[in-house]
């Protein structure tokens, strides 16, 4: 390669760094809660890219906190064990048998793998679950299908959050990685929807942003019309749109709505199938995905 071509490549890299400068200045010292899920969890290259993104945020002066789901891995393990599973209203029906698998996969597999990937870049990540240090307390929830309330078993909503353990880790320069299993006040363990848990944590931490990784480019106002992709939407407009959304997007957009109405300045849904999507959202002028802002 010629010297001119090498210089052009170097200048392009420098231009990218300079473009990020105002965003680095704006978000320095800010807490960012990132919900990790979808295809980004199952593709090896995307997993490595996500881990690198979190370390980049840490070195750039931000305070990333990761809340992960594990839907694909849970489904795979249930299939291997011959345990039937179903979804109602976008949420997994969680029997006691399914709950055992959920805990095993989230805490023992997905969380540990992500911690390991992040720590290939340095001793940053520490794994926690909602059962540790009273982080989350859950309350049983139901789902709605066609306007009817239905039972979904040991699925919980977040009743309370104690961020002491998380803030201690952040203050120590660590990257907390949270699995969403939590005890209820009734003594039963619950499977928290990771989107819901991420929103509650973002509010409790007074985070600057909530970023939710999905398997679509963002929110569509009129799915499957791909021209209806929404770049930015207010909380009030999102609340009006929620009843018409596809069931899989409802928990994600509800989480964004809860976060913004709880005081988080902005919540974002980004396409986790695109490598470094979190950085594209945080540090480019164009942004990426759909941003939810207060009314």
Swiss-Prot record:
Pathway linked to the protein: Amino-acid biosynthesis; L-arginine biosynthesis; N(2)-acetyl-L-ornithine from L-glutamate: step 2/4
* Location within or outside the cell: Cytoplasm
- Could you mention a single GO BP entry for this protein? arginine biosynthetic process via ornithine
For this protein, what is the EC number?
2.7.2.8
Q: Which InterPro entries match?
A: AceGlu_kinase-like_sf, AcgluKinase_fam, ArgB, Asp/Glu/Uridylate_kinase, Glu/AcGlu_kinase, NAGK-C
Q: Where does substrate bind?
A: 70-71, 92, 191
**Keyword tags:** Amino-acid biosynthesis, Arginine biosynthesis, ATP-binding, Cytoplasm, Kinase, Nucleotide-binding, Transferase
The molecular function terms of the Gene Ontology recorded here are: acetylglutamate kinase activity; ATP binding
Site annotation (Transition state stabilizer) points to: 35, 252
Primary location recorded for the protein, binned into one broad class: cytoplasm
Chemical reaction(s) catalysed: N-acetyl-L-glutamate + ATP = N-acetyl-L-glutamyl 5-phosphate + ADP
GO cellular component terms, alphabetically, are:
cytoplasm
Give a short account of what the protein does: Catalyzes the ATP-dependent phosphorylation of N-acetyl-L-glutamate.
Write down the PANTHER family for this protein, in alphabetical order. N-ACETYLGLUTAMATE SYNTHASE, N-ACETYLGLUTAMATE SYNTHASE, MITOCHONDRIAL
Per the record, the similarity remark reads:
Belongs to the acetylglutamate kinase family. ArgB subfamily.
Instruction: Please state what the protein is called.
Output: Acetylglutamate kinase
Give the organism, scientific name. Answer: Salinispora arenicola (strain CNS-205)
- Give me the gene this protein comes from: argB
């Amino acid at each position: 390669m010629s010297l001119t071509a090498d210089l052009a490549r170097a200048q392009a890299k420098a231009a990218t760094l300079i473009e990020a400068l105002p965003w680095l200045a704006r978000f320095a010292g800010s807490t960012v809660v990132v919900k990790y899920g979808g295809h980004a969890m199952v593709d090896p290259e995307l997993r490595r890219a996500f881990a690198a993104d979190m370390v980049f945020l840490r070195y750039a002066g931000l305070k990333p906190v990761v809340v992960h789901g594990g839907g694909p891995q849970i489904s795979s393990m249930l299939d291997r064990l011959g345990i039937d599973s179903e979804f109602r209203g976008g949420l997994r029906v969680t029997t006691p048998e399914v709950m055992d698998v959920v805990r095993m996969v989230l805490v023992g597999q997905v969380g540990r793998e992500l911690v390991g990937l992040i720590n290939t870049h340095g001793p940053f990540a520490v794994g926690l679950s909602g059962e540790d240090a009273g982080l989350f307390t859950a309350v049983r929830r139901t789902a709605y299908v066609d306007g009817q309330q239905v039972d979904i078993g040991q699925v919980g909503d977040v009743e309370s959050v104690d961020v002491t353990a998380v803030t201690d880790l952040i203050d120590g320069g660590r990257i907390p990685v949270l699995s969403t299993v939590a005890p209820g006040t009734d003594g039963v363990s619950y499977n928290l929807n990771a989107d819901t848990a991420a929103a509650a944590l973002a509010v409790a931490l007074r985070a600057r942003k909530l970023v939710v990784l999905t398997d679509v480019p963002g929110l569509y106002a009129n799915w499957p019309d791909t021209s209806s992709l929404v770049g930015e939407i207010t909380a009030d407009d999102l609340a009006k749109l929620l009843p018409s959304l596809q069931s899989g997007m409802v928990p994600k957009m509800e989480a964004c709505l809860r976060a913004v109405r709880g005081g988080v300045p902005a919540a974002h849904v980004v396409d986790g199938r695109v490598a470094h999507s979190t950085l594209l959202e945080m540090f480019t002028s164009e942004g990426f995905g759909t941003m939810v802002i207060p009314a």
